[in-house]
Amino acid sequence: MTPRPLLSFAAVAAFAVVAPAGSFAADKFVAKLQPLNAAKIGTAAKGTAKLSVADGKLVTVIDLEGLPPGIMHLQHYHGFPDGKQAACPAADADTNGDGYVDLIETEAVAGTTMVPFHAHPATLEIPNDTYPSADKSGAAHYTNTEAVADIENALKDKFKSPLLALEKRVIFVHGISEKSALPDSVKSLPGVPAHVTLPIACGTIEAEK
């Protein structure tokens, strides 16, 4: 199958949700990111995401390994705007039986794309060229400090509900090389190549013990 060309990130749809300061279930959270689609893409992406809330700031640190090297990887937390518990998809999320769990197939259990992990999360812009890129060894690091109020205000404008509820969200890492051939059955957002949004790792956000 001939790989589809990478289109502008301006074509990606954006969604987001976050919560009032002081209403967090905890002040430190962690997500252990485990591989998705590893058997198909030939690499097992994994890592750890740590999120902490202090002095009105949300600090996010993500360390990853096993990524397809040399490319930028979209990273976000996903969830349900109504506060329903999100979960990482299992193999049975592959409802069309093509061997891949694509972005659209994750929505039933994981919800929609919410907060992006790039240089400016409070913009809520999913299309962005400042997501982390993997080095030659397949490792990537992300760190960001953002005012909770800035994220809340943006999310309230977009979703009419500044609900963070980190413990009800999951984190996804996306993306494989555009040289990787995918069947047409692997679905993505309108106008966005499937290799950009294919989930390659996921972890549930939990209060750190």
Regions found by a protein language model. Give the residues of each.
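Bacterial N-terminal signal peptides that target proteins for export
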Residues: 1-10
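N-terminal signal peptide c-region/cleavage motif recognized by signal peptidases
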Residues: 18-20
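Cleavable N-terminal signal peptides
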Residues: 11-13, 23-24
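N-terminal leader/targeting pre-sequences
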Residues: 24-209
